[in-house]
């Protein structure tokens, strides 16, 4: 049954993304910025809803009150979530009250229809093989987008980690936060419970998203700041999904 539901969900994504992306690409000729962003987020909301309706993937979010309110549209924050699956890539723009600017590898732009649409959005796509140029672009574009009220989102581990595992936390998000004096918000997410990495077989269940309090970055050392972010995320992951982690011992 899971295989059938997952296949139906994949078909649902394919059938809906093609017309939505074509509309978005056409629309982008005339309109960019926030209106373009929210048009594309409409499909991400549909994708998140489809995972629930077809595959039984539910979610619960706590800590939204830790984020700036809609009345404070230009209060910039930098989001630093745990990265376990494709789910948070789809869901976070649908869950957050302000436009998000993802930092992502440029290869995603090559995905037909989906990549064409995100290429028209105010995001930061980088060549991970050119680290110096990539960081310069993140710093430059991050400043610009946060000044416009966007929230930059960077996955500190850089790539998806399997359930119960801890990836190597990179300091890029902390460096950007320190450079711009922007608070960094750690986020724990248990998406691998339902949507494991490198898999399109979705399991019914509940994904927990826990948003931490913003951590001030001004005047901090980026390595020390990232250790604090990592410590909060990993401790919260153990609290939310204890069966995925060893009962005793250190780093999983």
Go through each PLM region and give its residues.
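N-terminal membrane-anchoring alpha-helices
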Residues: 1-60
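Non-catalytic C-terminal accessory region of glycerolipid acyltransferases
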Residues: 3, 135-252
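Catalytic core of membrane glycerolipid acyltransferases/transacylases, capturing the structured
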Residues: 21-41, 54, 71-131
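Active-site phosphate/pyrophosphate- and oxyanion-stabilizing loops and adjacent acidic/basic residues
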Residues: 48-49, 90, 174-175
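A short, well-structured juxtamembrane/interface segment
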Residues: 50-76, 246
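Short acidic-hydrophobic, aromatic-tinged amphipathic segments that line or gate anion-handling sites
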Residues: 61, 124-127, 217
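Generic preference for hydrophobic
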Residues: 61, 79, 102-103, 209-211
């Amino acid at each position: 049954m899971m295989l059938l539901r997952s296949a139906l969900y994949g078909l649902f994504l394919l059938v809906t993304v093609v017309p939505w992306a074509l509309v978005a690409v056409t629309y982008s000729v005339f309109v960019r910025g926030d209106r373009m962003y929210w048009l594309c987020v409409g499909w991400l909301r549909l994708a998140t809803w489809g995972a629930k309706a077809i595959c039984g993937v539910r979610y619960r979010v706590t800590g939204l009150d830790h984020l700036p309110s809609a009345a404070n549209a230009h209060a910039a924050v930098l989001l630093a979530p745990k990265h376990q699956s494709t789910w948070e890539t789809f869901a976070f723009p649908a869950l957050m009250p302000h436009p998000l600017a993802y930092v992502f590898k440029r290869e995603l732009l090559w995905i037909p229809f989906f990549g064409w649409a995100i290429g028209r959005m105010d995001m930061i796509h980088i060549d991970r093989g050119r680290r110096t140029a990539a960081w310069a672009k993140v710093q430059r574009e991050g400043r610009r987008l946060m000044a416009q009220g966007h929230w930059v989102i960077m996955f500190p581990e850089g790539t998806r980690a399997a359930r119960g595992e801890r990836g190597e936390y990179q300091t890029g998000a902390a460096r950007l936060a320190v450079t711009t004096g922007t608070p960094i918000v750690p986020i724990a997410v248990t998406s691998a419970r339902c949507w494991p990495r490198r898999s399109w077989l979705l399991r019914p269940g509940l994904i927990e998203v826990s948003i931490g309090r913003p951590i001030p970055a001004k005047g901090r050392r980026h390595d020390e700041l990232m250790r604090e972010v990592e410590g909060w995320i990993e401790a919260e992951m153990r609290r939310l999904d204890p069966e995925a982690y060893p009962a005793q011992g250190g780093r999983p």
